[in-house]
């Protein structure tokens, strides 16, 4: 028996919604918590093929995609982040989803230690901790 993987699920409406334009333009964000270079991997609606795959430049995923607009005390990562169908097809892959999860866990720990909301985590300190833990957030992080 073959179990097909699920490429997409429900998404939050976040403080920011990542879009196709963010992927193809190589968007960079002040609140970046992950980076990717995976192409948009979209099957055609009739499931008879793939949409054209074009290698994008390196792009970043902003922390705001992990923060639901109307729910306090919650961060999300992986396929349920705030992203369009097209953008999700690029950021749903394991390395990027795992890095988003690491960022969410790190931010949650920082918020708990400081007694603040996850919305109020200082981005520079979150990025500093992620880099200390080996997360590459952009070209400046490459050796």
List the predicted regions and their residue ranges.
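Flavin (FAD/FMN)-binding glycine-rich loop and adjacent Rossmann-like elements that form
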Residues: 4-143
């Amino acid at each position: 028996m073959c179990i097909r993987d699920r490429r997409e699920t429900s998404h939050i409406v976040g403080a920011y919604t990542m879009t196709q334009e963010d992927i193809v333009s190589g968007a960079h964000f002040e609140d970046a918590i992950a980076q990717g270079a995976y192409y948009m991997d979209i099957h055609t609606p009739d499931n008879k093929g793939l949409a054209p795959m074009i290698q994008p430049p390196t792009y970043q995923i902003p922390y705001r995609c992990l923060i639901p607009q109307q729910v306090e005390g919650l961060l999300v990562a992986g396929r349920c982040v705030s992203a369009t169908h097209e953008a999700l097809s690029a950021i749903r892959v394991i390395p990027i989803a795992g890095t988003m999860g690491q960022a969410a866990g790190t931010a949650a720990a920082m918020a708990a230690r400081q007694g603040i909301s996850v919305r109020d985590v200082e981005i520079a300190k979150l990025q500093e901790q992620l880099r200390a833990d080996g997360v590459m957030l952009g070209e400046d992080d490459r050796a």
